[in-house]
């Protein structure tokens, strides 16, 4: 358990993948993102073209996180992200906690399997002091039914967001059997290379951090919504979220927070200093055939011989 805690989010392990799940239509997820990005002596890498996605690199704490925001109302996306997330960060409304859509989302997550999680309540400072206390008590009663031992983290200051990050980094990871038995990843970058014969058939290059079991190049890989495919090889590209990022001259990284935009596509980084780890062996590759091909001659019967008729009598 201790080794697992130390490897997750460290230099030698994959970044701590945190998925933000708003449970109320009024939940201020953007305020949560802003506070998480305001950490001192931290580097923020914004995912280009992905709303609400960024990586937080903190060399001082020797930790790195990747935050992805699930679209509110897209239940299938929430469930798919929960399959690969190290932690879920539920964003609650200060007054009501979660609405009917959030309740349905929680029921589906509990049925699928809930990974490690944390509860955050951004805002709430606009309420009068008395109503604020009443709302906090009401929210605590509602949380106790769904999450008996959970701690509620208010998010109004940078210090409170630091406490939340520390909790995410140190809490015990919950194990889910269906993903501990398999290798899985959330794609960081993807590129389709068309084949020579047809533009519709080619090779898909996917870059990401492998979690769970060791990835076997001869096994099949499942892409959500598209099916099963064979792999040709597994490469080791440079780490796009290194804890020692490139420092721009003239800027003090120790004092100012540096926000970097991933203007360079991650697939371009895959082409630089790529090391081939494994190549598929056609004799050992798992077949894509998932159903038995019927043999029309399998059920054919021959006329019994004289000896067989005598034995039957």
Predicted features by range, described:
Residues 1-86, 196-313:
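C-terminal effector/interaction modules appended to NTPase cores
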Residues 25-28, 92-99, 125-128:
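Short acidic, S/G/P-rich loop/turn micro-motifs used as interaction or catalytic elements
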Residues 30, 100-101, 130-131, 152-155, ...:
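Intrinsically disordered, low-complexity regions enriched in proline, serine, glycine
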Residues 71-96, 102-119:
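Inter-motif core of Ras-like GTPase G domains
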């Amino acid at each position: 358990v201790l080794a697992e805690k130390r490897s997750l989010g460290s230099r030698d392990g994959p970044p701590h993948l945190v998925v933000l799940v708003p449970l109320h239509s009024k939940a201020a997820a953007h305020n949560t993102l802003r506070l998480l990005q305001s950490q001192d002596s931290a580097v923020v890498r914004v995912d280009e073209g992905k709303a609400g996605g960024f990586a937080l690199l903190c060399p001082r704490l020797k930790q790195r996180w990747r935050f992805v925001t699930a679209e509110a109302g897209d239940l299938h996306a929430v469930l798919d992200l929960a399959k690969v997330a190290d932690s879920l960060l539920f964003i609650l409304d200060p007054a009501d906690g979660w609405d009917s859509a959030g309740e349905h989302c929680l029921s589906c997550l509990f049925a699928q399997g809930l990974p490690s999680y944390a509860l955050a309540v951004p805002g709430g400072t606009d309420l009068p002091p008395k109503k604020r206390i009443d709302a906090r008590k009401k929210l605590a009663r509602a949380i106790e039914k769904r999450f008996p031992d959970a701690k509620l983290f208010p998010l109004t200051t940078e210090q409170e967001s630091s406490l939340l990050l520390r909790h995410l980094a140190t809490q015990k990871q919950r194990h889910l059997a269906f993903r501990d038995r398999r290798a899985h990843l959330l794609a960081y970058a993807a590129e389709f290379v068309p084949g020579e014969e047809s533009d519709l058939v080619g090779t898909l290059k996917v870059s990401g951090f492998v979690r769970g079991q060791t990835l076997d190049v001869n096994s099949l890989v499942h892409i959500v919504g598209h099916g099963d495919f064979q792999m040709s090889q597994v490469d080791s590209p440079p780490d796009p979220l290194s804890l020692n990022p490139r420092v721009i001259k003239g800027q003090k990284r120790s004092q100012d927070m540096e926000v970097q935009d991933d203007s360079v596509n991650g697939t371009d980084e895959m082409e630089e200093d790529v090391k081939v780890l494994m190549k598929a062996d056609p004799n050992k590759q798992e077949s894509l055939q998932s159903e038995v091909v019927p043999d029309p001659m399998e059920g054919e019967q021959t006329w019994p011989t004289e000896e067989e008729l005598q034995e039957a009598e």
